[in-house]
Amino acid sequence: MFYKEKFPENIQEGVWDEKSCVRRQCGYVIDETDLPSEKKWLEKGAPLAIKEDGKVKVCKTAKAYEAAVKSATELKVYKGHLFAVNDKVAGSTISAIDTSNNDYDKLTISALAEKADKDAVLDDGDAAKVIGLNYATVYLDGMQSCTPTLQAYEIEEETLPYPLSDAVKVALTSRHAFKI
C-alpha cells in the first residue's frame, strides 16, 4: 500500500490578506529540474517565473550574509536558499557551495559583476519573468501544477519562504503590496 504525504511539516509559508488575493486563471506546471531532488514541497509565497515553454520555475533568491566587493569570487549568503552548483546568482555562475558553517553558505562564483551589500537580496536573473507568488503549498511529485497570485495585499514579507529582491518586487507590480 502506498501512502502519500498530504501535509508538510515545519514549512514556512507566506502570509497575506486572503480576501485581497486574486489567483491567476489556470494552473501552471512546475519545472522541477533545477530544484534540489530532496525538496518535497513548494511553499506558499515562493516567487514563480514564467519560462518560454509555459511552465513556471522558482526564481531563486538569497540574502547576502556579508558585503562582497565587485569582482569577488566568494559570496556568503544566509542558509535557506535553493541555489546549486552551476546556477547563476547576481550574474555570476556558482562553481562550489560550502555548507560547513551553521550561519551561512559560502558560494564560490565567477567574478561578481557588481558589489553586494550586507543583507542585499540577490536573484538568479529571472526576476523580470516573475508572474506571481505561489498561492498554496504543493507537493512536488514530478508533474505538479501550481497557481500563481495575480494580486495580493498586506504581504508579510518576513513570512515568505525566500527573500524577494527589488527586481522581483518590481515584476510583481503594484498589484502586490507589502505590509508596512
What are these regions (language model features)?
Residues M1-I180:
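Surface-exposed, low-hydrophobicity beta-strand/loop segments enriched in small/polar/acidic residues
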